[in-house]
Amino acid sequence: MNRVFNVTCLSALMASLVLADGPKDNQSAEVRPIPPPGIPVPEQEANALKTGLAALRTAIDAAAKAQSKNPMLPDLLPDVEIYHKAVDWALRYNEVFKPAELKAAAELLAEGMTRASQLAAGQTPWTKQTGLVVRAYRSKIDGSIQPYGMVIPGNYSGAPSRLDTWFHGRGETLSELSFLDQRRKQVGQISPANTLVLHPYGRYSCANKLAGEIDLFEALAHAAKFYNIDTNRIVVRGFSMGGAATWQFAANYADKWCAATPGAGFSETPEFLKVFQNEDVYAAPWYQQKLWHWYNATDNALNFIHLPTIAYSGEKDRQKQAADAMEAALRGENMDLLHLIGPGMEHKLHPDSLAEIERRLVDIVRVGRAEMPYEVHFTTYFLRYNHMHWVVVDELEQHWERTRVHAKMVTDSAVEVKTQNVAALTLDVSAGHSPLSPLKRPTVKIDGQEVSVSRPRSDRSWRVHLRKTDGKWQETLRAFENDGLVKKHGLQGPIDDAFMDAFLMVQPSKAGWNPKVDEWVKLEADRALFEWRRQFRGDAMVKADTAVTDADIAANNLVLWGDPQSNALIARVLEKLPIKWTQQMLTANGKDYAAGSHAPVLIFPNPLNPAKYVVINSSFTYREYDYLNNARQVAKLPDWAVIDLTKPRTSQGPGGIADAGFFGEHWEWKKN
């Protein structure tokens, strides 16, 4: 295919997809469904596809049985199952969006049957295939099958290879069926020479946030089992919504990639919505404005010192705002953004600009990712993102405030560190990489204080834990002083964080104390399952409270619906939760509420397994109104809230918010 034609046509397609939103989608009382309803499927074609689905299901089961002793079966079976899911869900959930997709569905069933037969015979030729390859994995989050696409160069020989990821644009009709059809037929907007390209599905159209963020890492881990990926030469790339994804992956994981090439999209929430939606969100509650830090790349611009970045915008594209905002943020950190402008372009990639990006990437990739920079500069706002090269932030003084670490290897026995809002950190250099002398006891000068610390080990690794107590830094034997409650990486909240790892929805088996609360719980719990499927493309795992096992508690974040009367697990953990809850009264953060008309939502370390979360009465916290623009798809509730059930549930909230806030660093109540 002609390269320029390929780029131009696909860019135009992306433009038509992303511009589906706009100021007309600012009416929270008139929210159109995302994804939209599909077209009617003629009965004859529907029946033929259902027959094909039944045959494919039988073939998949036969292949699984035939290969039951194959240790690679868990990684191979999803490559077949995804064909069944794609067609099944399109029919089951009215997600056939155009007549051509019916032909594509038949093709997918045929391809799935071929793979099932091959797998049953112990053959997996698609794992050695070059060109366009559909792949899939089973997610740890909800057990769902999630697709991704690979583009394998014809000369790929198994040698360590550069890999580029390409994050797709907004696609309200991008079902699994549509995505698989694209990944079978379209190379996409990039195809660099001698480069593997991975196209994540990203859990549909969420700008690769939350579970969509984890999707990238699960897809990369699966791909690495079959392709020899050079981990020092991974490039994150995308355009439009995919450009937004690139900005956030670049900002929050700057030490993982070799380069980033974001195009258009958005790089933060409030200013983009002002420009693109004519929507002023600065009246949002204070805790929502704190939560913008999660995905605002502008707030974490310092991290780009570790990641070569090439931004692109069309000259006439309103989404040029994304790179303009990043340019200003980087300038504030004394960095100058390389921002290529496509002359005369609206929401499209200019072929000349793409060629310039590719030319520059060749030089960047030749150098590769820095494995052991002598200087590290890192900023974050919460401990989900707590790591940059050899600096690990273990505890904060206060979550959702700007946190910074500047660390430098000065000599072979001296390290300088400056911190802001850090209570404990670890300096952790992997084996073979420490530039410090193993013969000298090094000194860490941290915030002006000199601390004599442990020497590097004989394998040239070096790990030092430092903690600040009463304003004084000292080395400690481990990262955490005791086993008490503390906010740390993976256990820091907010509510939405629980849905980025394995979770189990636990439903009540009895009536609760108050009918109004029961009614609200039923509506919200049902909505949680419905919206998880629609927005994150999986069936959430569900059990009744009486069916939950010790193994479930060990393996999952528990999402408990109900009250202490209706849900036995809420009753079990209530004593060790910070709330007080009786039939008459709910007490949260020192305030009392009538239990008949209020309900708590919160996240907390699970008293039954403190390595996991317990969540009370909540799923992911953005709602239907937020689906209309990807920049709105950010966390809407903090660690806890009290819901006023006398106020209606809406497209923006589960009811009235009587109060809400974050827990302190030891999961204690704190004043808002």
Predicted regions and their residues:
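Gly/Ser-rich "nucleophile elbow"/oxyanion-hole loop immediately N-terminal to the catalytic nucleophile
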Residues: N155-A159, N208-M241, A251-W257, N303
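Amphipathic, heptad-repeat alpha-helical segments
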Residues: G22-V80
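Catalytic His-Asp charge-relay segment
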Residues: H306-S313, L338-H339
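Solvent-exposed alpha-helical segments and adjacent loops
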Residues: T426-N672
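Active-site machinery of serine-nucleophile hydrolases
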Residues: P160-Y227
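Mobile cap/lid helix-loop segments that gate and shape the active-site cleft of serine hydrolases
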Residues: G171-R183, D255-L307
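C-terminal catalytic histidine-bearing segment of alpha/beta-hydrolase fold enzymes
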Residues: K316-V415, N421
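A domain-start/cap signature at the N-terminus of enzymes
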Residues: G22-I39, Y93-S161
